[in-house]
């Protein structure tokens, strides 16, 4: 068993308690399947579903609830092509002028939905994700925070054994293509169509990076909040692969935080795939430099355990991959602008 598998199993046990051992073993088997190339390739192929635009048809799970109603209204006002939603037992009714369905499968069949956003309470969110996977919705964005980690281990096991559905989240702000499609809770007005791809584990720091890249005139091509939980559906590498292949994305902002190995893995990916004269500039900020070991800092995944997952190690790994690491989130925009200026990209 590799160090990554051991670390993931330890995290599952730590987060879920001793009863998490079974879930940890399940996750370990999932990682081993990925490493052996079994089915992992099919889920990787779903990265293409991360691209959203003005033609993306979105449904909302938890449509008639308080959060679903508020954020669906915001999405409609932004111009997102929201085509309906689901609330079990309320099928056949109208909400916000759109049809309500009992199941995701029915919603997809009737509307042609290509994406779903989930605003379902934590105890039921994993079941909502699984329902979307079973309905083969291409992109599922789960906003819900506080989903039991054992539930997400099982969801991840299911995800990595198929290739039709891509999950972003949970515990994330969502994804936005400025001016075209907003799926999530981010404030639309701070975004501006532009040249920078942003990926982040932190929601509020995503907004900070967005505001700054807007202020310096660079704007954003696509912004993805991958969430702060240990077991999510999309990681840094998935998003970096999308950004590196996207001609509209000329620079990348990566915002990480303490806990796990996602940033170190991203650094290795960038070393291999973003080097040479045509490499895209990457600017990063890692939150939690002063965080004490063993204490969870906000997100379930933001914890330094067993001497691993510290900010200094992540910063060192990213710098070795040619990433410009800002020591302050307030400098992300200016760091990227200076790099564009240096490369004569303005």
UniProtKB/Swiss-Prot annotation:
The active site is at 299 (tele-phosphohistidine intermediate). Keywords: Acetylation, Ligase, Mitochondrion, Nucleotide-binding, Transit peptide, Tricarboxylic acid cycle. Substrate binds at residue 207. Pathway: Carbohydrate metabolism; tricarboxylic acid cycle; succinate from succinyl-CoA (ligase route): step 1/1. Succinyl-CoA synthetase functions in the citric acid cycle (TCA), coupling the hydrolysis of succinyl-CoA to the synthesis of either ATP or GTP and thus represents the only step of substrate-level phosphorylation in the TCA. The alpha subunit of the enzyme binds the substrates coenzyme A and phosphate, while succinate binding and specificity for either ATP or GTP is provided by different beta subunits. HAMAP family: Succ_CoA_alpha. This is Succinate--CoA ligase [ADP/GDP-forming] subunit alpha, mitochondrial.
């Amino acid at each position: 068993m590799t160090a990554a598998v051991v670390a993931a199993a330890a995290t599952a046990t730590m987060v879920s308690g001793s009863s998490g051992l079974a879930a940890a073993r399940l996750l370990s088997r999932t990682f081993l399947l990925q490493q052996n190339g079994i089915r992992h390739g099919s889920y990787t192929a779903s990265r293409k579903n991360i691209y959203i635009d003005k033609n993306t048809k979105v449904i909302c799970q938890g449509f008639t609830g308080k959060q679903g109603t508020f954020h669906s209204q915001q999405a409609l006002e932004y111009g997102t092509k929201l085509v309906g939603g689901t609330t079990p037992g309320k099928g056949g009714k109208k909400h916000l002028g759109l049809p309500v369905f009992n199941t995701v499968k029915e919603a997809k069949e009737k509307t042609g939905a290509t994406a779903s956003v989930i605003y379902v309470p934590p105890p039921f969110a994993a079941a909502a994700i699984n329902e979307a996977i079973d309905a083969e919705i291409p992109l599922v964005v789960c906003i819900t925070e506080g989903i039991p980690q054992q539930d997400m281990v099982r969801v991840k096991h299911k995800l990595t054994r198929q290739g039709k559905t891509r999950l972003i989240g949970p515990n994330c702000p969502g994804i936005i293509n400025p001016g075209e499609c907003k799926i999530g809770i981010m404030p639309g007005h701070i975004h501006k169509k532009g040249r920078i791809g942003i990926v982040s584990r932190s929601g509020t720091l995503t907004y900070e990076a967005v505001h700054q890249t807007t202020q310096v005139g660079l704007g954003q091509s696509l912004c993805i909040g991958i969430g702060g939980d240990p077991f999510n559906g999309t990681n840094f590498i998935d998003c970096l692969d999308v950004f590196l292949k996207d001609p509209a994305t000329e620079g990348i902002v990566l915002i990480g935080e303490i806990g796990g190995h996602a940033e170190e893995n991203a650094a290795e990916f960038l070393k291999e795939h973003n080097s040479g004269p045509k490499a895209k500039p990457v600017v990063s900020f890692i939150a939690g430099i002063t965080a004490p070991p063993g204490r969870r800092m906000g997100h379930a995944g933001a914890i330094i355990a067993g001497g691993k997952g510290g900010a200094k190690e992540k910063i060192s790994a990213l710098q070795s991959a040619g990433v410009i690491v800002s020591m302050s989130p307030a400098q992300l925009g200016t760091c990227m602008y200076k790099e564009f200026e240096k490369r004569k990209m303005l």
